[in-house]
Amino acid sequence: MKKGNLEANTKTVPFYKLFFFSDSTDVLLMIVGSIGAIANGVCSPLMTLLFGELIDAMGPNQNNEEIVERVSKVCLSLVYLGLGALGAAFLQVACWMITGERQAARIRSLYLKTILRQDIGFFDVEMTTGEVVGRMSGDTVLILDAMGEKVGKFIQLISTFVGGFVIAFLRGWLLTLVMLTSIPLLAMSGAAIAIIVTRASSQEQAAYAKASNVVEQTLGSIRTVASFTGEKQAMSSYKELINLAYKSNVKQGFVTGLGLGVMFLVFFSTYALGTWFGGEMILRKGYTGGAVINVMVTVVSSSIALGQASPCLTAFTAGKAAAYKMFETIEREPLIDTFDLNGKVLEDIRGEIELRDVCFSYPARPKEEVFGGFSLLIPSGTTTALVGESGSGKSTVISLIERFYDPNSGQVLIDGVDLKEFQLKWIRGKIGLVSQEPVLFSSSIMENIGYGKEGATVEEIQAASKLANAAKFIDKLPLGLETLVGEHGTQLSGGQKQRIAIARAILKDPRILLLDEATSALDAESERVVQEALDRIMVNRTTVIVAHRLSTVRNADIIAVIHRGKIVEEGSHSELLKDHEGAYSQLLRLQEINKESKRLEISDGSISSGSSRGNNSTRQDDDSFSVLGLLAGQDSTKMSQELSQKVSFTRIAALNKPEIPILILGTLVGAVNGTIFPIFGILFAKVIEAFFKAPHELKRDSRFWSMIFVLLGVAAVIVYPTTNYLFAIAGGRLIRRIRSMCFEKVVHMEVGWFDEPGNSSGAMGARLSADAALIRTLVGDSLCLSVKNVASLVTGLIIAFTASWEVAIIILVIIPFIGINGYIQIKFMKGFSADAKAKYEEASQVANDAVGSIRTVASFCAEEKVMEMYKKRCEDTIKSGIKQGLISGVGFGISFFVLYSVYASCFYVGARLVKAGRTNFNDVFQVFLALTLTAVGISQASSFAPDSSKGKGAAVSIFRIIDRISKIDSRDESGMVLENVKGDIELCHISFTYQTRPDVQVFRDLCLSIRAGQTVALVGESGSGKSTVISLLQRFYDPDSGHITLDGVELKKLRLKWLRQQMGLVGQEPVLFNDTIRANIAYGKGGEEATEAEIIAASELANAHRFISSIQKGYDTVVGERGIQLSGGQKQRVAIARAIVKEPKILLLDEATSALDAESERVVQDALDRVMVNRTTIVVAHRLSTIKNADVIAVVKNGVIAEKGTHETLINIEGGVYASLVQLHINASN
């Protein structure tokens, strides 16, 4: 990660812009809240005014009868002031919290809406799914923090500042002027800190955003990671990024501490100045002691208010930095805007499509031209098939017709009108897309089909699923249409997903139908029926088909052969066949390896299907079936409530063990830190006493105490940064340790764990980023705080009891109220911003899904539907935010009232004791100041400390991950390693169900033996469990009963990492990481370095070297998120090279060539044939040509192996399963 781009992220938006999205209600709330905040702020300087009066009342009238009466009046005024503060504080907090919650929710949904309306190029180049989710969960919390009650608090503090100075000027303008000189220093130190903190926090944010991208990529393709034992690599790149964040964190801590230290130096020097000059004023200008104290306290407390505004400023700056990226996106005008309602809307379209002189290159690779002057005419109502090599630009044609991209030059026309002139939403509504890797959303089957049409009825949805031949398998599911499909549709097999995608397109009833390899993942039976369904809906529609299986395209009216971005031939099947040397004939010849395979060719989904749920889950396994999902959901909240009491402090502290020396040092410095305020209390009492002494003593004492004040300030400058720095190191290291522990734990969980709804990549990413940071508040920060507070308390009590034990005891009885009040205020001050975490996890999953499958969202114009789902999931959050605002407001208001009443009682009691001659007024002040300043010190220290209540919940969720023992842990070093692997595999009496679907038995008593060096093909219908065999062999899951052996040793007894290294997996939807091609191939080595020679050898074997070398950056080309920058065939070849680099003893090919065109398939098949030599190979496939040459063909049906033998044997079994599957194909192709 380059430093450069971290630096760039420190831009911010102007503050007013945060409120850009408020409505009239918000404006009203903000006005009322601000009035409340101003009133509340002025209460504090008014209190100092009353304090001055008290001093004058008690000072000179030592033995006067009037003392109690004068003091009583002042005390009563204090109580009234408290009542006023109560109302003002309530308005301040409640209004600002409510409006903040409302506006943040609005920003969040606007951001998602903007993301959804961006053109596809934006996602190729600028934005990744992880980043969107990170910004929506992390950055909006920072924004909310900057525009909610922190603004109210800020206004309150500023009005304290202004009000204070007005009062100070009225009471003694000269002294005030002199003391004012310290304010610029204060402001400057505050400003400098805000700037540096912003920079550090922006860098930290950027590093974390990249780290959460690593999490999203790794967990989103956990099967690939596990299969290639890539856990270590993921860990090391994650650690590198969190280390960067740690460094920013420490820097931030030190700077904040330095800022506080400098501020306190300025405060205490201001008191020093006031004491010295105030003494002079009493002597020369006849000021009263009360007036001098009033001015001093007012000036300083007003300045303190300014200092207390610094955390608000920090929050504002962090919020402005977070908003910059989000607002930049919100304001980005997409090149192709779905929400733009301008443009033509016709009665209807005929559906004639023309590409005229199109030049085009993908935004992510602008220098590589895909088309240079490409032209193609598709008459309305006809079916045109595009054929050609992988990467020749067939799917690009479809992207251009859908207007995912605009051509660089040339035009795409429909009915002679340029696509750009149509209203985008309307024209996309006329186009139906079914693509090669169908994308489903984490919701029910019904909702997924419903994306095809706004407000579709259940009947329409059922009819569409019948047409797509999906009704049968849906009815078999326990919940039917209400079944949840999981993240990226992982709960369904490839064939099932594809049929739902087709039903979704059918429901749309489009004029133009785009089929991008639409039947490539289906088994023979489904394919025949789906093909019929497609044939039925293709009537009278313009259809564009991209297919590799040439048999699917024979009936097309026009076949266009594309080669390197040019049409080299065009015509019908029979016309093109006449030219024996033509490109089409050559492609066909490649596929006609022999007559039979040719006849069966149509079986794109030939003898088997897109596998049971195993391979597609290379995607990511998430939600389970809906009922279970709901149960699991309830269970986990219950669990978290039960557990939240159970995580002991010692347990968390143990994690900080390595930092004990730092913590001890920090604690000692922190203790010194804690004594500063109580000592300040004594000094202050001494100054009050000095002001009522004889002139010569007054002169001497005021000078002496001034010097002491300055020394106290110097101590603060040393102590604050040191404490903060030490605790930042300890806290930062703890966060870093927890993050890497958790991530390590999660990466090594068994694959089945990710099938649970709460463990989706989105949710885990959010947890790793938010929770780890919160735990820090429980250890370092809270230790630091406790030490400061204990030191303050002890010092305060010693001072108070030495002065006057009677007053001390009475004040002590009352002081807990100040403590409680301080605690409540801080609790509210910190805990206001609603705990957004859990509520947003669900909502971020919606966002995660939509952004991850943005093409599907765009092609079905489902943006508004996604927004609705998102808003629905956010409703409760806003409601609870409002509720919290009201409760916090009441609490905050009451706390002020209590504070003022307590002050009043203290002085009333003190006055009575002075009158009774039990004590003198100096001691009353000393006790009062020592104790109240201790309380102030404690609450002030606490107000700077982050809130630990959320930390407890976070600790529970973190420890739940750390404590969970992975059922199948690849770190486990125990287990045998075989010297020499032959490759005999035996599955004995296997029964198996997926945990998330315990009522669907996948295998019951399945037996299969595979001899070393044999190639075994698994065939069977879609969903019969073929891919599950592959998942079991890699120990993604363990069977419920029975056992699997390798060379006679049970898999569970072998070392897991070693076992996975013996197997090379190539799946149907290859998962590549957002990294270079080189890194993706080298990934096969499982964390060991792969040499350049090995990488090139592997890609040559996989027939990838040629296409890689032809790309501009060659092996250094970045493949994009989920490999989006490469075509299906190119991705697959990179995936095969990755498996080959591993030099595995056992090859697992799960539909490995289903996404390739004839030419690549032949070469890849050759490559696979070469690599298969002397290796045990298990093939899941539906193409007969692939299956026919297998040594053994095993037919999976109803959870058992129904038949096994060679092609010749099985084909001759009368009425056998295999024979009838083959027969099906022959009929299908004829």
Swiss-Prot record:
Q: What GO CC annotations are associated with the protein?
A: cytosol; membrane
Q: Which GO terms describe its molecular function?
A: ABC-type transporter activity; ATP binding; ATP hydrolysis activity
Please report the stretch or stretches of sequence annotated as the ABC transmembrane type-1 domain.
Answer: 30-318, 663-950
Q: Which domain of life is it from?
A: Eukaryota
What positions does the domain ABC transporter occupy? Answer: 353-589, 985-1223
Positions binding ATP 1 in this chain are 388-395
**Binding residues for ATP 2:** 1020-1027
Q: Does the keyword Membrane apply?
A: yes
Report the membrane topology from the UniProt record: Multi-pass membrane protein
Q: Biased-composition ranges for Low complexity?
A: 603-617
The segment annotated Disordered runs over 602-621
Hydrolase keyword on record: no
Q: Which residues are glycosylated?
A: 540, 615-616, 759, 1074, 1174, 1227
Which keywords label this protein?
Answer: ATP-binding, Glycoprotein, Membrane, Nucleotide-binding, Repeat, Transmembrane, Transmembrane helix, Transport
Tell where it localizes.
Membrane
The portions of this protein that span the membrane are: 27-47, 78-98, 154-174, 177-197, 253-273, 286-306, 662-682, 707-727, 798-818, 889-909, 924-944
Q: What is its main location?
A: membrane
- Name residues in a coiled coil: none
Kindly give the PROSITE patterns that the UniProt entry links to this protein.
ABC_TM1F, ABC_TRANSPORTER_1, ABC_TRANSPORTER_2
Report the sequence similarity comment from the record.
Answer: Belongs to the ABC transporter superfamily. ABCB family. Multidrug resistance exporter (TC 3.A.1.201) subfamily.
The molecule here is called: ABC transporter B family member 5
**Source species:** Arabidopsis thaliana
